[in-house]
Regions:
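Short, positively charged loop/turn segments that connect secondary-structure elements
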Residues: 26-40
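Proline- and acidic/polar-enriched loop/turn elements at helix boundaries
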Residues: 23, 37, 56-57
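Positively charged, polyanion-binding regions of nucleic-acid-associated proteins
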Residues: 1-15, 36, 41-49
Length: 63
């Protein structure tokens, strides 16, 4: 499965911190740096595909 799909599935499950997401991606076989992951998550927020909560956790936007 591709990284983007796995990340989308993770974000759809619940709210996670970037560190928690990195760990879940590692369990799925993906090695991503925390810095690049955080940058990508912030890009998803900017594009309107994800939400960043006040506590620093990320999730997908509800449809």
């Amino acid at each position: 499965m591709n990284l983007g799909i796995v990340l989308s599935e993770i974000l759809a499950e619940a709210e996670y911190t970037p560190s928690e997401i990195k760990e879940l991606l590692a369990q799925a076989g993906y090695d991503v740096s925390l810095e690049k992951l955080t940058d990508h998550l912030n890009l998803l927020v900017t594009m309107g595909s994800a939400r960043k909560h006040p506590d620093g956790k990320f999730s997908t936007l509800p449809f």
